[in-house]
């Protein structure tokens, strides 16, 4: 099995669940306290809570925030849907757009009267990098970031998407300081989500070498049939995003899966929504074009012959699909 979709869906191996992580209001919860200390050591935040990683869960977080909220349209599907739901209830959201090159338009933050900004250090699907440090020069808002694929120490609050980290839709984990959010009572904390999330983060490993190799091989093989929505130099070093002319990504995704090669079009693909990349559409492309997008991410090491094999199979399947579509 060759997983090139690990940033969209990763499966935690050798899951171990102990009764030690069952929380009680009447006895010490030493194992759980140890977990919270490990999070603090890794990320520097003093407080932790769990929440439903869904539009309803994010809506609950919005309602806890005492202030004006802005959201980058490059965030997770659940967060975007929560923003729309929040607006339907009569509240206001300031939306920060993407440029045609896939970068967050940080200049839209200038002169905005906002207190909280949902902005991650990368855009979903394309994994185009965003400088939280630069964003802080343009706004005094507290910045709340998804740190599942990349952690930026400049974020004021971070959260983790457990479905993408462990392959199970347990609660999300939120880390923060001060009194931005309320803490949960013992009986409402999803301690298993906290444990499994930490296990995944401690075992998270990225391959920084494969991007350049795959990029070269794909260009060489596909030639004029490959194109790029975003500059590869602007994306996370362990990710690669491109488009293939004349086919829908889902056709290639399904075909390659039969060869145990797993790739993605984006969140709409990995979450089972059967939707093309919303991010590409937010960049100004139409829905049809967004169906061409393909995302790779790199964790495991691969030998040169394995890379060649993947590229050869991808090229063969691409030509077959394209011939059938013509």
Please name every model-derived segment.
Residues 1-326:
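Pyridoxal 5′-phosphate
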């Amino acid at each position: 099995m060759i997983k090139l979709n690990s940033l969209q869906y990763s499966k935690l191996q050798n899951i171990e669940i102990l009764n030690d992580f069952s929380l009680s209001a009447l006895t010490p919860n030493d194992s759980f306290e140890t977990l919270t200390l490990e999070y603090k050591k890794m990320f520097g935040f003093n407080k932790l809570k769990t929440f439903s990683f869904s539009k309803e869960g994010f809506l609950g977080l919005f309602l806890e925030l005492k202030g004006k909220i802005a959201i980058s349209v490059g965030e997770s599907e659940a967060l975007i849907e929560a923003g729309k739901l929040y607006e339907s209830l009569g509240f206001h959201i300031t939306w920060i757009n993407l440029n045609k090159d896939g970068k967050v338009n940080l200049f839209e933050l200038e002169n905005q009267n906002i207190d909280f900004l949902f902005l991650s250090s990368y855009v979903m699907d394309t994994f185009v990098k965003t400088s939280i440090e630069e964003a802080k020069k343009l706004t005094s808002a507290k910045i709340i970031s998804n740190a599942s694929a990349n952690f930026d120490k400049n974020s004021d609050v971070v959260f983790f998407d457990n479905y993408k980290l462990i392959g199970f839709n347990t609660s999300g984990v939120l880390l923060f300081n001060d009194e931005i959010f309320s803490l949960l009572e013992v009986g409402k904390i999803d301690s298993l989500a906290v444990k499994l999330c930490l296990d995944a983060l401690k075992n998270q490993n990225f391959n920084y070498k494969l991007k350049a190799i795959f990029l070269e091989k794909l260009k060489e093989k596909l030639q004029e049939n490959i194109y790029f929505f975003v500059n590869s130099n602007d994306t996370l070093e362990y990710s690669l995003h491109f488009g293939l002319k004349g086919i829908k990504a889902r056709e290639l995704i399904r075909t390659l899966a039969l060869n145990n090669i797993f790739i993605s079009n984006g969140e709409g693909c990995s979450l089972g929504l059967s939707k093309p990349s919303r991010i590409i559409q937010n960049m100004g492309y139409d829905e049809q074009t967004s169906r061409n997008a393909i995302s790779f991410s790199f964790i495991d090491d691969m030998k040169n012959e394995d890379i060649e094999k993947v590229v050869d199979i991808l090229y063969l399947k691409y030509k077959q699909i394209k011939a059938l579509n013509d």
